[in-house]
Amino acid sequence: MNAPDKFTSLLSLTREPFPASHKCLIPGSRPDLNVPVRDVLLTNGETVSLYDTSGPYTDAKVEIDVRRGLPGVRGAWITERNDTESYEGRSHQALDEGLKHAHDHDAQRLAELRAGASALQRTPRRAKAGANVTQMHYARRGIVTPEMEYVALRENGKREWMAEYLANEERAKRVAGNPMGASIPRIITPEFVRDEVARGRAIIPANINHPEVEPMAIGRNFKVKINANIGNSAVTSSIEEEVEKLVWAIRWGADNVMDLSTGKNIHTTRDWIVRNSPVPIGTVPIYQALEKVGGVAEDLTWEIFRDTLIEQAEQGIDYFTIHAGVRLPFIHLTADRMTGIVSRGGSIMAKWCIAHHKESFLYERFEDICDIMKAYDVSFSLGDGLRPGSGADANDEAQFAELRTLGELTQIAWKHDVQTMIEGPGHVPMHMIQANMDEQLKHCHEAPFYTLGPLTIDIAPGYDHISSAIGAAMIGWAGTAMLCYVTPKEHLGLPDRDDVKQGIIAYKIAAHAADVAKGHPGARSRDDALSKARFEFRWQDQFNLGLDPDTAREFHDETLPKDSSKVAHFCSMCGPKFCSMKITQEVREYAAKKGVAEAEAMAEGMAQKSREFMAGGGEIYIPIQPAS
């Protein structure tokens, strides 16, 4: 099967619209600014509108050809600013796919993949001489861009349906969240988005060479976002599988995706992914740079790394993880750790520093990196190369020395108006999580925090998506802006599509729990809508309002598969006689019939049962009468 056919076959499994759902567009101030949301039609006639990350893939009305990529929704916005220029760009080299593969005998296969990707190529753009094209640069000059308006509309969504669930003032006050120092307005305006980006408290990752991206914001005063990692390795996965993983990930709610490919055809894989992604794409450029020198860390040079940054910026990568905080003076601090340096990027740079006994070129050349970033509006994700790899190493001096350095680098990036977020751990026991957030806010000036979990315990291989989602929910409530998912395969192997889904669902739970705890406007309304459906035994609505309708329906149908069970006033947990919600409904119906309050109905019912008990002789144990 050739590549395009395989793409089509794989994506056909991933493009199914969600049940009882359709896309709806929220119009902006201009004809080409429309924000998609997912409307769920309930069986009682209500409609619930949900934030949607799936792009056009779940829209049955849209035809998608992955060989041509998605439409460039931001193309006109970028062009009309008149501060960028098209140019020829660097030529693709065999070395871009990795040194080993530049010398292998698979040239024909590589040529086929490149030919298949040729229709995806866009002529790259960059800032005109002396210009700065970052969203932070515009924001600091008081300009509200279409991207900022898009974010505001997206964060607000359609709130009309929430009115019923927000009307009870007593309940709203009782369950109101604690924002933990965040400043979340009731309504997100474009001006608020601009101000948050200008302050550096939020970023909108949106490379000018990724016009297909649907703008989103990462910041503690916005919804908590999640990131999913995909990417091949030297031993497994193909380009087709990685593109399908991308579409699968955003279907289930990934707000961002990182391509962490370290195997063959790295450049070509990225072409396919970026051109077909409606969400921001991030990378760790040092991985590809290492491939270019055959995997020998000490052979890395600034020139090779710089060329890799430009290569990826031209392709449209929206944010780079750069481990510029791994400095020579810090490496000895990891010597007594239980698990040493566990970050791949961190270990690469540590090895380079030790081999040359020199300061990291990422640190020394940081301002040169800023010049590249602001020419394409690539955001920094300042990597935590010295993050703890076990609970025993949490919050040590190596971790916090690097964090303080990342704060210093943030100030340098902001001097160039480059958008910046800070990466965090890792492995942190529950009682040490708040200290991580406190230190980050103290030293990194409220730049968005982006954490990998953290895992709260180390004894759950195969279940690390659960052990880490606990920490993710806690640190998300404390102020982390984006959570990097962990799959069941963490520490064990490369995740497949089912692992990706499980990791995303676990992290959607964590992110939503954090939003509810923070009191994010409207966050709890979806919970209330599902709770109402549950109480009213609207099973289909329960399934369809959940994070994973497929699994909910499957679990229900394992014991009650008949269609009649979808309207039954009980489930297999309690059965028809002991369903608490059914009993409560009967009490309410009895009260309504008698024209009394629920409490009175309960009292009357108890009195009636008392009379029946006494009339029966007042005996606790009644002899069984033989059947006549």
From Swiss-Prot:
Named cofactor requirement(s): [4Fe-4S] cluster
Pathway this chain belongs to: Cofactor biosynthesis; thiamine diphosphate biosynthesis
InterPro entries: ThiC (IPR037509), ThiC-associated_dom (IPR025747), ThiC/Bza_core_dom (IPR038521), ThiC/BzaA/B (IPR002817)
Binding site for substrate: N229, M258, Y287, H323, S343, R344, G345, D384, G385, L386, R387, E423, Y450
Residues noted as binding [4Fe-4S] cluster in the record, renumbered to the chain: C571, C574, C579
Cofactor note: Binds 1 [4Fe-4S] cluster per subunit. The cluster is coordinated with 3 cysteines and an exchangeable S-adenosyl-L-methionine.
Binding site for Zn(2+): H427, H491
Coiled-coil blocks: none
Keyword annotations of the record: 4Fe-4S, Iron, Iron-sulfur, Lyase, Metal-binding, S-adenosyl-L-methionine, Thiamine biosynthesis, Zinc
Enzyme Commission numbers on file: 4.1.99.17
Biological processes annotated in GO: thiamine biosynthetic process; thiamine diphosphate biosynthetic process
UniProt KW Iron keyword: yes
Organism superkingdom: Bacteria
One of the record's GO molecular function terms: zinc ion binding
Reactions catalysed: 5-amino-1-(5-phospho-beta-D-ribosyl)imidazole + S-adenosyl-L-methionine = 4-amino-2-methyl-5-(phosphooxymethyl)pyrimidine + CO + 5'-deoxyadenosine + formate + L-methionine + 3 H(+)
PANTHER family to which the protein is assigned, alphabetical: PHOSPHOMETHYLPYRIMIDINE SYNTHASE, CHLOROPLASTIC, THIAMINE BIOSYNTHESIS PROTEIN THIC
HAMAP family per the UniProt record, alphabetical: ThiC (MF_00089)
Assembly with partners or alone: Homodimer.
This protein's name: Phosphomethylpyrimidine synthase
Species name: Variovorax paradoxus (strain S110)
Gene that this polypeptide is encoded by: thiC
